[in-house]
Amino acid sequence: MHQRDHTAARRRTILRAALLTGVTAMTMPHVTSCSSADEQQTPEPSRTPGPTAGGGVRGKVLLAYFSRPGENYYYGERTHLEVGNTEVMARKIRALIDCDVYRIEPVDAYPASYDATVKRNVREQQADARPAIKGGLPELDGYETVLLGSPIGNVRAPMIMTTFTEQLDFANKTVVPFTTHAMSGLGTTARDYADSCRGAIFAQGLAVQGEEVGKADRAIRAWLNRIGFAMA
């Protein structure tokens, strides 16, 4: 009799614990990329799945990024950026690790207007365009890890990133995406880079909301440490 009472009590305890866990999960705020300006949230890293995900950094590192200054989105409004959000993030990364840096620049510069840039980006996506890159491309020989940085617009990286990745040989390179965004995180970079960086190994990426990039130092450092970078 005592054994049955003890068993029943234990089952009730387990049931109460399960219910409390479920309630907690439902009531916890979901962390999204659209936090308010005064919440001062630390940006959350986003994991990049891929056909060979799970790679760690190794060897000599190249950081290649595309960034756009000018009028930009800011919590539903507009603001002017002297330095684009992705470049701010790239500089923070460069300050922490030993790497070479290559800035991806278009032959046909994007408009200063945010809305005009959005429209052009959509047109290029719909046309599956390959915007031309100004200057020569870097040689990947000698590099084992490549950081790829870009903004995210209309849920994916600008098409100029595909221009870049399709023209280089990423076989056996470790590819590490990082992005700045309004609300789409890493977007479709996992799928897109898996298609264009054939034979690459993919490490965990990081997405930072554009408005929050100025105070993302802690998140960037934690991410770089987590995927195996030696800090400068």
At which residue positions do the language-model features occur?
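N-terminal secretory signal peptides
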Residues: 1-9, 24-25
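N-terminal beta1-alpha1-beta2 submodule of the flavodoxin-like/Rossmannoid cofactor-binding fold
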Residues: 33-143, 155, 225-231
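Active-site-proximal beta-strand/loop segments in catalytic clefts of secreted hydrolases
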Residues: 66-67, 104-107, 149-151, 178-181, ...
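N-terminal export signals
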Residues: 13-34
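Short, surface-exposed alpha-helical segments at coil->helix boundaries
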Residues: 83, 87, 91, 158, ...
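Helix-loop-strand module that forms the ligand-binding subsite of alpha/beta enzymes
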Residues: 111-201
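Glycine-rich phosphate/pyrophosphate-binding loop and the adjoining helix
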Residues: 201-232
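Extracytoplasmic entry segments of secretory-pathway proteins
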Residues: 3-6, 16, 20, 40, ...
